[in-house]
Amino acid sequence: MNTIQVILFAVVLVLTVTVGQADEDSAETSLLRKLEEAEASMFGQYLEESKNSREKRCAVENVPCDKDRPGCCREYECLKPTGYGWWYGSYYCYKKKERLIST
């Protein structure tokens, strides 16, 4: 009789602990889900904009580029080479020249 009570007590204890943990886990996951939804609604647009505004891979100075789709970095422009590279017949990325506006 005494061993049956100990076994029954152990089973009830194990069930109580597992059910209690399941309730805590479900509460944590529901709270986590709510926080993720709130974060997505608040910062979703901002993250999307910052991802798209990031500069993609680009070509630097003296790298061949396509005239129609240059692919040069912001501070460079796609120009036909003058001087030593004119015989290659392709365009290259060169640093943009500072243009002074006369007043």
From Swiss-Prot:
Compartment(s): Secreted
Protein name: Omega toxin Ap5
UniProt record similarity statement: Belongs to the neurotoxin 14 (magi-1) family. 08 (Ltx-4) subfamily.
Cysteines engaged in disulfide bonds, as pairs: C58-C73, C65-C78, C72-C93
InterPro entries: Toxin_22 (IPR012627)
Entry remark concerning the domains of this protein: The presence of a 'disulfide through disulfide knot' structurally defines this protein as a knottin.
Segments forming a coiled coil: none
GO cellular component terms, A-Z: extracellular region
Superkingdom field: Eukaryota
Residues making up the propeptide: 23-57
Assigned keywords, A-Z: Calcium channel impairing toxin, Cleavage on pair of basic residues, Disulfide bond, Ion channel impairing toxin, Neurotoxin, Secreted, Signal, Toxin, Voltage-gated calcium channel impairing toxin, Voltage-gated sodium channel impairing toxin
Tissue distribution of the protein: Expressed by the venom duct.
Record-level Gene Ontology MF annotations: calcium channel regulator activity; sodium channel inhibitor activity; toxin activity
Organism: Acanthoscurria paulensis
Signal sequence coordinates: 1-22
